[in-house]
């Protein structure tokens, strides 16, 4: 059996506030889902119509069972989702306070995905995948970092594209400067890179004072620096395509030959920005794997991101193909 993409990184149970606008202390109800950037991408791409697999890990606990069962129900291949003893499955609690406050609390002590090893990678036949998508957070600690590097090496040996979603989460890095050091080395192995302007700046952080996170907005940090310089430096690493997400404005695609494409977004009333970037990546993957041109692929990506910001959750609200095409047509088409 062949697959369109294998995503690598974290998986969690996500608990979303059902009380829109409530402060964390006042949350009365939570709804359950699964999450983690590579998980959201795998589920989102599967709903659109791709065959997807997840390379991650859970603990030997009921939470891990919930995660595995949910992935099965979504049709994501879990052959390479490990159950690692003496670990505890990850949990995330998410507040939703529109228009711009979305606090996150991560519970990742002894996280299973951080214990993934080279031995786990040895069991993967990369020749059955059309692409390999890496979460930047999976590079944060050993032994998962070495596993990620080896997985990338194996992917390149069978000549499938390596796609990096920078997925910057400052909380995952003990020294924020390490993030830049590791990512700059990894970028030399990438064909396609996906990130926000802030995530591009994160690759070149030299001082912790460049970073600030307010009200636990882990997914939306403020980082000082020159975005245009960061874009140029990323392209200098030799990537074929850089996709820069610019929120409501859409995105900008930078090609290796110097071509720049601005792809407009879709106007919606935002409820929750969490997961929008992952939905974007899923949409792009669908177009890319199916041979669409960059503009159309990114237009679909923007639509998926816009769809997600109107929802009260992450991948449990990811659109199916017919839904997102209807959405695009209602907004004037591709």
Question: What label would you give each PLM region?
Answer:
Residues 1-6, 153, 205-334:
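Conserved phosphate-binding/catalytic region of the ribokinase-like
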Residues 131, 137-229, 249-251:
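Conserved beta-alpha-beta core of the PfkB/ribokinase-like small-molecule kinase fold
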Residues 1-77, 93, 100, 116, ...:
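Glycine-rich phosphate/adenosyl-contacting loop at the front of the ribokinase-like
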Residues 125-127, 184-187, 236:
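A short, aliphatic-rich alpha-helical micro-motif
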Residues 46, 72, 153-157, 187, ...:
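Anion (oxyanion) recognition and catalysis
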Residues 51-134, 325-334:
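Conserved N-terminal subdomain of the carbohydrate kinase-like
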Residues 45, 196, 277:
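Short, conserved phosphate/pyrophosphate- and ester-handling motifs at nucleotide-, phospho-/glycolipid
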């Amino acid at each position: 059996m062949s697959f369109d993409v294998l995503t690598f990184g974290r998986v969690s149970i996500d608990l979303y506030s059902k009380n829109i606008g409530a402060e964390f202390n006042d949350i009365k109800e939570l709804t359950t889902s699964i999450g983690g950037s590579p998980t959201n991408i795998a589920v989102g791409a599967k709903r659109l119509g791709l065959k997807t697999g997840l390379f991650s890990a859970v603990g030997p606990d009921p939470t891990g069972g919930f995660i595995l069962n949910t992935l099965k129900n979504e049709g994501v291949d879990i052959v390479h989702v490990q159950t690692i003893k003496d670990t505890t499955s990850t949990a995330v609690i998410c507040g939703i306070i529109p228009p711009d406050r979305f606090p996150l609390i991560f519970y990742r002590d002894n996280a299973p995905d951080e214990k993934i090893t080279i031995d786990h990678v040895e069991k993967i036949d990369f020749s059955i995948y059309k692409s390999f998508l890496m979460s930047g957070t999976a590079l944060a600690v050993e032994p998962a970092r070495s596993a990620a590097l080896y997985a990338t090496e194996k992917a390149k040996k069978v000549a499938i594209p390596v796609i990096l979603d920078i997925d910057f989460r400052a909380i995952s890095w003990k020294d924020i400067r390490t993030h830049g050091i590791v990512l700059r080395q990894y970028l030399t192995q990438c064909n396609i890179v996906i990130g926000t302007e802030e995530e591009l700046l994160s690759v070149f952080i030299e001082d912790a004072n460049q970073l600030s996170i307010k009200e636990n907005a882990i997914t939306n940090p403020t980082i000082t620096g020159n975005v245009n310089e960061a874009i140029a430096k990323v392209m200098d690493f030799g990537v074929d395509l850089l996709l820069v997400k610019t929120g409501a404005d859409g995105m900008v695609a930078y090609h290796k030959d110097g071509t720049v494409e601005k792809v407009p977004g879709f106007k919606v009333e935002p409820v929750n920005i969490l997961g929008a970037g992952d939905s974007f990546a899923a949409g792009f993957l669908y177009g890319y794997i199916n041979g669409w041109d960059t503009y159309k692929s990114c237009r679909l990506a923007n639509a998926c991101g816009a769809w997600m910001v109107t929802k009260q959750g992450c991948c449990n609200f990811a659109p199916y193909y017919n839904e997102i095409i209807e959405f695009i047509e209602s907004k004037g088409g591709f």
